[in-house]
């Protein structure tokens, strides 16, 4: 498969799986790519990071929107959830059977590997967008401080 066909296929999948809207549970705007239309219908932390990296090559504005949406789910203590259920009503059967660690809110209380800074850095290097960087730094700082405080109690890194 040549590069052009590969890019075309990737673009088609990412556009087909793109979800945009306003969450009825918190009024926030969202724009992200679902990993799978059936199996994984919500925003998943590390999938969004990888989607954003891929989107750098296809649609840089959507790459930024993907990370902004994920960062907008950060809690006041800095935690960014593993899954954010932006469209709660769309998959009630998924929510009733497949979520471990689901809180009363519309996100999971578990986490995935903390690769968000890498994705944000890749976007910034590709775009040079200072406003995006200025928005991301405090969110990322709070998130990594949360990890240090909550997930590393013995302080061994």
Locate predicted features.
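Helix-terminus loop motifs that line ligand-binding clefts
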Residues: 60-127, 132-134, 141, 145-157
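Residues at structural and domain junctions
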Residues: 26, 37-38, 52, 102, ...
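Low-complexity, Ser/Thr/Pro/Gly-enriched N-terminal "stalk/linker" regions
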Residues: 1-43, 64-65, 69, 78-83
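Bulky hydrophobic/aromatic packing residues
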Residues: 25, 36-40, 44-46, 115-118, ...
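Hydrophobic core/packing positions within alpha-helical solenoid repeats
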Residues: 48, 52-55, 120, 140
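Hydrophobic alpha-helical segments
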Residues: 7, 49-51, 60, 116
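Solvent-exposed loop and edge beta-strand segments that line ligand/cofactor-binding
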Residues: 30-49, 56-57, 94-113
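Charge-dense, low-complexity intrinsically disordered segments
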Residues: 1-4, 57, 134
């Amino acid at each position: 498969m040549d590069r052009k066909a590969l890019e075309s296929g990737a673009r088609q999948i990412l556009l087909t799986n793109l979800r945009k809207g306003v969450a009825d549970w918190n009024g926030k705007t969202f724009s992200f790519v679902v990993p799978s239309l059936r199996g994984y219908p919500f925003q998943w932390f590390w999938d969004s990071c990888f989607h954003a990296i891929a989107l750098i090559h296809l649609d840089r504005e959507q790459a930024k929107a993907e990370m902004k949406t994920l960062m907008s789910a950060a809690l006041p203590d800095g935690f960014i959830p593993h899954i954010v259920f932006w469209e709660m009503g769309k998959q009630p059967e998924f929510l009733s059977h497949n979520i471990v660690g689901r809180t009363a809110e519309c996100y999971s209380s578990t986490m995935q590997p903390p690769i968000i800074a890498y994705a944000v850095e890749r976007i910034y290097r590709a775009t040079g967008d200072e406003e995006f960087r200025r928005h991301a730094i405090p969110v990322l700082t709070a998130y990594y401080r949360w990890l240090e405080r909550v997930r590393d109690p013995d302080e061994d890194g």
